[in-house]
Amino acid sequence: MAKIHVLLKKEELDSQRLPGKVVVVLDVLFATSSIVTALAHGAVEVVPFLNGEAALQEAARRPKGSYVLSGELNAVTLEGFSHPMPMALLGENLAGKALIYSTTNGTVALGKAREADHVYAAALLNGEAMVAQIERVHAGDTVLVVCSGSADNFNLEDFYGAGYLVSLFASRGSAHELTDAAVAARLLHDHTDAMECLSASRVGKMMLSRGLEHEVRFASQKSRFPVVARLEDGSLRRLAP
């Protein structure tokens, strides 16, 4: 029987315990939502970095016009970088290009998960595709659903996203052993509207105060894209259907 854990923040990841595990990273507002959206709109890869300096170094190694450089630090878009939110990235003509991407939490969480056997990026936007991939390829494996959080703090929207994934696992009828955190996440999801929950979160409130309701609403959509984003050799790519 597969076991599903939900970790409340990326700081709970223990690299020594990751071998043999499947890790699914969530940063609903907005890193993993942006990653899924970019791959759904033709980006050939998303290359996540821990900070803007490393992202700039990677960009310098690539031909101009072959990539989009995007990132933020503490919710402020980095100078010289494109805005890192999903709808903003849709205006960047990503088709056929790499997205070089640095964020405060989501890309850091992906980096912390790299010792796992398999690492994926997930959001509300690709929940069904993500769960189907795990059921098809990783049945029986231990799955860690990692909420990125913010600077060692719990984030409501990531926990809601984890609950959506757990709810989808349950709806498929497969037997899973759930930790208490996984059960709690599912209960939150099953009794709360997505937009309501995201808007009530600290990050969601901040985005709304900046006139970015459209970005929050976009990220609140469930299973809009049939995208599976897998991290391999430092790059997130869309798996073929």
Annotate each language-model stretch with its function.
Residues 80-118, 132, 156-241:
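Long, charged alpha-helical interface segments
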Residues 47-93:
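Class I S-adenosyl-L-methionine
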Residues 148-158:
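Phosphate/ribose-phosphate-bearing ligand recognition and processing surfaces
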Residues 34-41, 58-59:
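Short active-site loop/helix that positions an aromatic residue
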Residues 11-16, 23-37:
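Short acidic, Gly/Ser-rich segments with clustered Asp/Glu that frequently serve as metal-coordination loops
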Residues 134-142:
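Glycine-rich phosphate/diphosphate-binding loops that line cofactor/substrate pockets in enzymes
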Residues 103-105, 123, 145-149:
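Short, structured patches in soluble enzyme cores that scaffold and shape functional sites
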Residues 4-5, 21-24, 44-47, 65-69, ...:
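Structural motif
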